[in-house]
């Protein structure tokens, strides 16, 4: 059924495809034509509708009759109508606007008339009253109103005129619209008719679409019926196929069984052959071992021989070196050259030997082929092509010629080489050549290739050559007739001369080139490697009559690059032409030249061909640049153009002619090699060793080393020739002078110039010294093929007539808004008076001034100019680039223009402009809220921005403000900042706003705004300062202070009310407070939070408990840790020395230990620094005791804020905090002196933390602690109570401790459970309290196992042998643990579990039992050692598990239990193993057996009987091939099998822990239901 389901979709798809084809055929029938649909739609429409359609058709006919002119006229009329409508709308808007303005104008006139009447009435009233001033004023108002009235009248008249003109325009527009009203109506009707036509057409289209939809629906139903019929037919066909498949399957199974029987027999036979083959292989391996050992001995002899030769050669080299040094020559250079020559000779001899061997190989192959060919010729004599030389014949002729030429020299070289090299290398060469001859796969393939005929089928036995029938053969002589011979000779001669036919017209023979080519020269320029270039040639027939043309080809050296496409056109008349396509694909960057040869009827001709690479063609546009005459100081420039007309770019560089060029890479490398030759003396040893190695390997060099050998010879010759000139070449190049030259190059001096481009380089002429100036330059290029170009530059420098002797005017340091003056002197050397114009740059004209601005200087005289400088604060912005804002330096260029002189005379004004500002920082001081019981101090800074010192002082200070130090007066240096303290102490609650004024010596005032709020808090403290008595470390001092609420009445006039500034007074009632302690302070305040009622006070206790800083204790503990680690390392190093170095003296050992300690101390210190100390550690406690004894008294001060809030703290809801006001804050100052303690611990290095360590639960540990009274008086002791249910108990105590006396306290620790316990014991005296911290840990046993997953798999073992594996148990507790090992197979309760059903029956997922198959001999298959023992704390115990099976099984298992103290089971380890009879095993597949052995099975212990009884065991592998989607291929079914080999107990050099495993991957593709048998054949070899 699954097959049916998988095939049905495919059948449906096929049916759908057929139906779609039928539908496409039906839809393409004529009945679906649009015309037919249109005719049907017209027939179905009602008569009324048809009449409307007819009317529309008549309208359409009328519209069609309109000419193009009518349409154009209608279009223009529509545009005119739209323009008229737009103009009408605009004019209408404009008219309305004008009418509005006219109404407004009339309203203003009415208003002015009324105002005139009112003013006239007032004038009359004032005249009657006699108020002439008012009358005059009113008359002025009347005149103004009259003028306004006149203006309004004028405006009204103008508005009326504009309105009238607008109305006229409106009338004209309406007249034009009236004229076009008829066209507007006709156009509207036409638009409506067009809309009706479109509606009718839409209705027709709808009808046609509905008809088409009906046909589509009918086609769909037809396709459905066809698909149902097709599915029925496919179902019947599929059912028939299934029946046929079942029948075929039965037949196939019958034949398959027979085939499998034959295969089994064949497998048995192959297995026997395999055993025999393995036996032979083992014998070969044994023989190979013997030969390897013999070869090793031979190789050792050769190596000893080579070492002796190398030593002899080294002695000869040293002797030769001494002789050369005695003669005064360079021994190193001589030896290097000599060794190079020897290397080259050795390589040459090796190369010749190799050529000889290769020649012999080739000759032997050719002789072999010749023999085979002769043999074939005897069998099948060739019928044709006897005189044609084959490739093999050509090769044989070449080899024979080569042998004749090189036989004698080769023998001499061979003899010389054998005499010089000795027997060692020759033997190696023989071995290498024999290996090459025997193992070269290319030789066999070549032999096979050469053994085949050139034409397939010639050597086939069934091939018969073609024979001409006897009736077709004429009776002719063997050599042909005489006429045939003459014709043949003439034809051959004509073909050799390549003249086919001489052309003679009118008795005139054509002489010359038969075809002309256009172009005459085919030139491929500037080509790139890899690209393809194509060009066409036109060949024109220049002969007298018809001619032919044939392509012969290109020359030999062009055939790899040039391809000619030429289709012979046939006969060409005179003057006709044909085209030839030439394709050029360059593969080397090289110029090529040649010809393309053609053959015409009258002779041969060729077209020249040229291929040019990219080249540089560089030139300068001029070789001389003449600047002419210029005044000294002026600057001018010219440009020179470098042009590249070639197709290759390069790098250029413009240099002065005197500057040397940079050396190329090759030259630098040559110089470097020469330097190394003369200076690097250490290279001698490297060269000697490399020569000795290369001398041994020289016999194995190949032909590829010939090129490098020739290059080395050339290099040696060049060095020998250039050795005298070498010191000149290695001289240091002096850099060009840094002085300014008059003719220089511009910014662009080097760069890249591309192909077919040009670059302009500027040349700058700046005359400095009068006189003629000239310079030479050169242009160098990186491309060595480009020559260096040279050009020359000349110019003349002329001196100026006017100059300034002081070109720089220094005004020193100037302040803003201060006037500074100076005079500038101008000289002239001219013999005539000159007009001078003094000019200041426009940026500085507001700050600098030169007086006068214009003047005349007499001949050969001087002229003085006044300079005025008044810097303003806008100078940095105005000056721009002339002023440096960082350094405040002004460099102002001044210009003196001289008549008839191009270059002006300039001088510079230098000044350092600084400000006189003093800056107070911050700009505003806010003291905030300050109570009347305190003073607030804040710091301000005064910064001098000037570069000059200034005196200052704070003046007119308020009474409640003070400035310190020196009461705010002093002198501030340039750019200095002074710090001042401003102290503010209010006397009453109000807001304060005031200014601090700082006045400088130049009477400039700088003000600082200050503000503050005086606060009268509702609470006050009894005293604001507490001085504690001297308190010992880790002791406590307590002081009391009262918080008072003195606010009793809201209406008391004599007392000030609590308030914040000028706010309302605080409400009377309960007031709460809270003290905020600073972090990490030794202060404790109780209560820190409280409420005080009006007229009441609250007592507060302040406790002071000083302790040592944590950081200081850790610093003190670090040396102790370092010392302890050094002691441990010293003991560790001394232990082996005492055993091994008894004979050495004590001083030697001490020196060695000191060195070792010094080396080890550094890492230990770093390790201890990284280690984190705990307060309970011994080092920490010892360091604290040391610091306590050495503690020096100290004094600290703390300020504790107390915040105040209105209300009772009890009234708050839950944990809701009160709204404390930050302004009503009181401050309490504490003075805290600290001294050393009076009672200290003398035992345990003075530590106060005592750790009893790890104590087993139920055990008891006791410690004794000694305390001492270090004070000068006796002290009474009192002890705090310990937890009565806790593990700590104080066993003794005393009530008095004498001065300097010591007492021992005895403490015990008895844990009842595994916990970490800690308590404190306080020893109380009148001078302080000593606190002892007691710690201890109750420990339970705990171990860990090294086996992960609690499963130990012993793997596969050959039955009868054993294998061992180990694991470790580690004691992680701090106590020794007693352990014992138990196996479940040896347990007494094992028999109870065997009475139940087997595991594979009750639980299919878990097939095996915990205790699996056991040995048949009664011994346990698993054993463990040791069985019992004790593990020390932190130690590891090794255990060995031995697996010894006596028969084959895959289900050996057992469970190992680790029991502690014979009670507690700590770990359970599952032991597994498998045993096989053979060394090979296979894992994987489906199980075919059960994990429980049958009791009826009788083991076979005899190997001979076992082999007879043994059968092949099948492995069931089930592969599920699932295909989810028919469209996509499903992934192959995959199962993995592992084939392994078991190591035997035979001794071997290396024995790995796990067997060799090989995975066999089985894949199944396709729909396969048969069962296959896969046989694994493997070979067991002895491996390392």
From Swiss-Prot:
Coiled coil segments of this chain: 300-379
One Pfam family in the UniProt entry: Ig_CFAP74_1st
Keywords noted in UniProt: Cell projection, Ciliopathy, Cilium, Coiled coil, Cytoplasm, Cytoskeleton, Disease variant, Flagellum, Primary ciliary dyskinesia
The keyword Cytoplasm is annotated on this UniProt entry: yes
Biased segments, Polar residues type: 692-706
Residue stretches of biased makeup (Basic and acidic residues): 707-717
UniProt effect for mutating residue 328 to D: In CILD49; uncertain significance
Region (Disordered): 692-739
Location(s) in or outside the cell: Cytoplasm, Cytoskeleton, Cilium axoneme; Cytoplasm, Cytoskeleton, Flagellum axoneme
Biological processes per GO annotation: axoneme assembly
Record keyword Glycoprotein present: no
GO annotation, cellular component aspect: axoneme; cytoplasm; nucleus; sperm flagellum
Function of the molecule: As part of the central apparatus of the cilium axoneme may play a role in cilium movement. May play an important role in sperm architecture and function.
Disease field: Ciliary dyskinesia, primary, 49, without situs inversus: A form of primary ciliary dyskinesia, a disorder characterized by abnormalities of motile cilia. Respiratory infections leading to chronic inflammation and bronchiectasis are recurrent, due to defects in the respiratory cilia. CILD49 is an autosomal recessive form without situs abnormalities. Affected males also show infertility due to defective flagellar morphology and function.
Family: Belongs to the CFAP74 family.
Protein name: Cilia- and flagella-associated protein 74
Organism: Homo sapiens (Human)
Gene name for this UniProt entry: CFAP74
């Amino acid at each position: 059924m699954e097959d049916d389901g998988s095939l049905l979709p495919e059948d449906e798809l096929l049916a759908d495809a057929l139906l779609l084809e039928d539908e496409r055929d039906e839809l393409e029938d004529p009945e679906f034509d649009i015309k037919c649909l249109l005719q049907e739609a017209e027939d179905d429409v009602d008569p009324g509708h048809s009449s409307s359609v007819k009317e529309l058709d008549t309208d359409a006919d009328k519209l069609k009759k309109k000419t193009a002119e009518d349409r154009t006229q209608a279009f223009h009329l529509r545009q005119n109508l739209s323009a008229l409508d737009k103009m009408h709308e605009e004019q209408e808007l404009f008219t309305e606007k004008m009418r509005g303005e006219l109404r407004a104008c009339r309203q203003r006139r009415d208003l002015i008339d009324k105002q005139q009447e009112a003013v006239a009435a007032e004038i009359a009233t004032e005249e009657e009253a006699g108020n002439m001033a008012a009358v005059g004023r009113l008359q002025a108002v009347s005149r103004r109103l009259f003028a306004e009235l006149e203006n309004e009248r004028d405006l009204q008249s103008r508005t009326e005129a504009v309105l009238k003109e607008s109305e006229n325009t409106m009338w004209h527009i309406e007249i034009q619209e009236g004229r076009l009203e008829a066209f507007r109506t006709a156009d509207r009707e036409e638009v409506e008719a067009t809309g009706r036509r479109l509606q009718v057409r839409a209705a027709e289209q709808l009808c046609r679409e509905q008809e088409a939809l009906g046909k589509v629906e009918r086609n769909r139903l037809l396709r459905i019926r066809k698909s149902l019929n097709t599915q029925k037919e496919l179902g019947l066909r599929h059912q028939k196929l299934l029946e046929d498949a079942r029948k075929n399957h039965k037949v196939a199974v019958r034949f398959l069984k027979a085939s499998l029987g034959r295969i089994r027999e064949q497998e048995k036979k192959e297995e026997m052959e395999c055993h025999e083959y393995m036996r032979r292989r083992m014998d070969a391996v044994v023989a190979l071992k013997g030969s390897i050992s013999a070869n090793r001995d031979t190789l050792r002899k050769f190596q000893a021989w080579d070492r002796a030769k190398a030593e002899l050669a080294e002695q000869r080299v040293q002797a030769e070196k001494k002789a050369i040094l005695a003669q005064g020559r360079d021994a190193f250079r001589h030896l290097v050259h000599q060794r190079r020559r020897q290397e080259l000779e050795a390589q040459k001899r090796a190369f010749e030997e190799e050529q000889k061997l290769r020649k012999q190989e080739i000759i032997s192959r050719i002789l072999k082929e010749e023999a085979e060919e002769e043999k074939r010729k005897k069998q099948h004599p060739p019928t044709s092509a006897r005189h044609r030389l084959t490739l093999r014949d050509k090769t044989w002729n070449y080899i024979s010629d080569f042998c004749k030429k090189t036989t004698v020299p080769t023998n001499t070289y061979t003899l010389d080489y054998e005499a010089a090299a000795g027997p060692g290398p020759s033997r190696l060469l023989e071995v290498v050549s024999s290996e090459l001859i025997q193992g070269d796969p290319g030789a066999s393939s070549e032999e096979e290739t050469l053994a085949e005929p050139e034409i397939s089928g010639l050597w086939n036995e069934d091939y018969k050559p073609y024979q001409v029938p006897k009736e077709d053969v004429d009776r002719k002589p063997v050599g042909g007739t005489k006429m045939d011979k003459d014709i043949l000779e003439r034809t051959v001669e004509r073909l050799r001369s390549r003249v086919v036919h001489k052309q003679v017209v009118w008795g005139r023979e054509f002489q010359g080139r038969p075809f002309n080519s256009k172009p005459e020269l085919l030139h491929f320029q500037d080509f790139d490697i890899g690209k393809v270039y194509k060009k066409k040639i036109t060949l024109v027939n220049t002969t007298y009559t018809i001619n032919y043309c044939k392509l012969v080809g290109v020359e030999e050296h062009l055939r790899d690059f040039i391809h000619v496409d030429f289709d012979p056109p046939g006969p060409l008349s005179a003057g006709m032409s044909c085209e030839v396509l030439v394709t050029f694909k360059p593969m080397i960057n090289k110029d090529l030249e040649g010809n393309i040869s053609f053959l015409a009827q009258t002779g041969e001709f060729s077209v020249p061909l040229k291929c040019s690479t990219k080249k540089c063609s560089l030139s300068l546009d001029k070789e001389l640049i003449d600047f002419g005459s210029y005044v000294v100081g002026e600057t001018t420039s010219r440009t020179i153009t470098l042009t590249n007309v070639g197709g290759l770019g390069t790098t250029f560089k413009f240099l002065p002619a005197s500057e040397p060029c940079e050396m190329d890479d090759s030259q630098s490398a040559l110089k470097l090699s020469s330097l190394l030759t003369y200076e690097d003396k250490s290279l001698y040893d490297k060269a000697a060793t490399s020569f000795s190695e290369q001398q041994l390997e020289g016999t194995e060099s190949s032909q590829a080393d010939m090129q490098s050998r020739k290059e080395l010879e050339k290099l040696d010759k060049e060095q020998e020739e250039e050795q005298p000139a070498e010191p000149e070449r290695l001289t240091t190049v002096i850099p060009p002078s840094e002085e300014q030259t008059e003719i220089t190059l511009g910014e662009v001096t080097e760069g890249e110039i591309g192909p077919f481009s040009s670059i302009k380089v500027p040349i700058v002429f700046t005359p400095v010294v009068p006189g003629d100036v000239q310079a030479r330059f050169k242009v160098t290029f990186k491309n060595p093929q480009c020559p260096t170009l040279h050009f020359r530059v000349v110019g003349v420098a002329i001196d100026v007539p006017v100059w300034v002797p002081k070109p720089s005017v220094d005004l020193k340091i100037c302040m803003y808004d201060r006037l500074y003056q100076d005079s500038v002197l101008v000289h002239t050397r001219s013999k005539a008076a000159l007009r001078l114009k003094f000019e200041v740059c426009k940026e500085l004209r507001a700050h600098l001034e030169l007086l006068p601005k214009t003047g005349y200087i007499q001949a050969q005289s001087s002229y003085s100019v006044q300079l005025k400088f008044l810097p303003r604060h806008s100078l940095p912005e105005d000056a721009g680039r002339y002023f440096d804002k960082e350094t405040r330096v002004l460099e102002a260029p001044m210009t003196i223009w001289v008549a008839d002189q191009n270059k002006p005379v300039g001088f510079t004004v230098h000044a350092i402009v600084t400000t006189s500002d003093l800056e107070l920082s911050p700009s505003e001081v806010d003291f905030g809220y300050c109570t009347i019981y305190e003073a607030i101090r804040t710091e301000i800074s005064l910064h001098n921005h000037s570069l000059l010192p200034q005196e200052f002082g704070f003046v007119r200070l308020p009474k409640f403000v003070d400035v310190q130090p020196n009461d705010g007066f002093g002198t501030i240096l340039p750019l200095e900042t002074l710090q001042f303290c401003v102290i503010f102490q209010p006397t009453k609650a109000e807001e304060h706003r005031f200014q601090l004024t700082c006045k400088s010596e130049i009477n400039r005032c700088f003000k600082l705004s200050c503000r503050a709020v005086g606060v009268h808090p509702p609470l006050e403290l009894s005293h604001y300062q507490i001085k504690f008595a001297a308190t010992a470390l880790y002791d406590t001092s307590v002081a009391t202070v009262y918080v008072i609420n003195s606010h009793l009445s809201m209406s008391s006039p004599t007392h000030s009310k609590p308030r914040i500034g000028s706010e309302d007074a605080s409400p009377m009632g309960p007031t709460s407070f809270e003290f905020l302690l600073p972090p990490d302070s030794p202060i404790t305040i109780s209560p820190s939070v409280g409420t005080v009622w009006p007229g009441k006070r609250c007592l507060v206790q302040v406790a002071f408990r000083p302790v040592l800083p944590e950081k200081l204790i850790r610093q003190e503990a670090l040396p102790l840790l370092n010392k302890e680690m050094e002691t441990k390392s010293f003991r560790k190093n001394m232990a082996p020395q005492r055993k091994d170095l008894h004979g050495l003296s004590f001083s030697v050992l001490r020196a060695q230990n000191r060195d070792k300690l010094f080396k080890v101390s550094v890492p230990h210190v770093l390790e201890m620094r990284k280690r984190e100390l705990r307060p309970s550690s011994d080092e920490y406690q010892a360091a604290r005791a040391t610091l306590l004894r050495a503690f020096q008294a100290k004094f600290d001060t703390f300020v504790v804020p107390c915040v105040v809030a209105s209300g009772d703290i009890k009234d708050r809801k839950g944990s809701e905090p009160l709204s404390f006001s930050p302004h009503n804050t009181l401050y309490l100052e504490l003075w805290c002196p600290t001294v050393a303690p009076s009672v200290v611990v003398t035992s345990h290095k003075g530590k106060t933390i005592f750790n009893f360590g790890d104590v087993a639960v139920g055990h008891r540990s006791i410690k004794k602690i000694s305390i001492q009274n270090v004070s000068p008086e006796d002290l009474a002791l009192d002890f705090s109570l310990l937890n009565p249910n806790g593990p700590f108990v104080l066993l003794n105590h005393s009530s008095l401790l004498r001065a300097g006396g010591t007492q021992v306290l005895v403490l015990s620790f008895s844990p009842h459970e595994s916990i970490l316990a800690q308590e404190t014991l306080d020893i109380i005296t009148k001078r302080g309290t000593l606190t002892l911290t007691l710690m201890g840990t109750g420990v339970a046993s705990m171990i860990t196992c090294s086996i992960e997953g609690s499963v130990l798999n012993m793997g596969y073992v050959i039955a009868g042998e054993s294998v061992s594996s180990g694991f470790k148990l580690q004691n992680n507790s701090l106590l020794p643990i007693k352990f014992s090992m138990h196996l479940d197979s040896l347990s007494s309760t094992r028999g109870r579990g065997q009475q139940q059903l087997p595991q594979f029956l009750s639980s299919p997922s878990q097939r095996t039992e915990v205790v699996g198959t056991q040995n048949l001999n009664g011994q346990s298959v698993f054993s463990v050692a040791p069985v019992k023992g004790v593990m020390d704390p932190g130690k590891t115990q090794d255990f060995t598990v031995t697996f010894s099976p006596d028969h084959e099984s895959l289900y050996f298992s057992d469970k190992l239990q680790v029991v502690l103290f014979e009670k507690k089971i700590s770990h359970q380890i599952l032991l597994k193993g498998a045993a096989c009879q053979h060394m090979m095993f296979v894992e994987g597949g489906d199980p075919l057996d059960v994990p429980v052995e049958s009791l009826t099975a009788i083991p076979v212990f005899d190997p001979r009987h076992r082999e007879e009884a043994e059968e092949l065991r099948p492995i069931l592998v089930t592969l599920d091939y699932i295909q989810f989607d028919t469209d996509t291929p499903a992934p192959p079914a995959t199962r993995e099998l592992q084939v392994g080999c078991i190591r035997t107990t035979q001794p071997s050099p290396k024995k790995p822990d796990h067997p060799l495993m090989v995975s066999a991957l089985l894949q199944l593709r396709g729909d396969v239901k048969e069962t296959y048998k896969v046989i694994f054949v493997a070979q067991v070899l002895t491996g390392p």
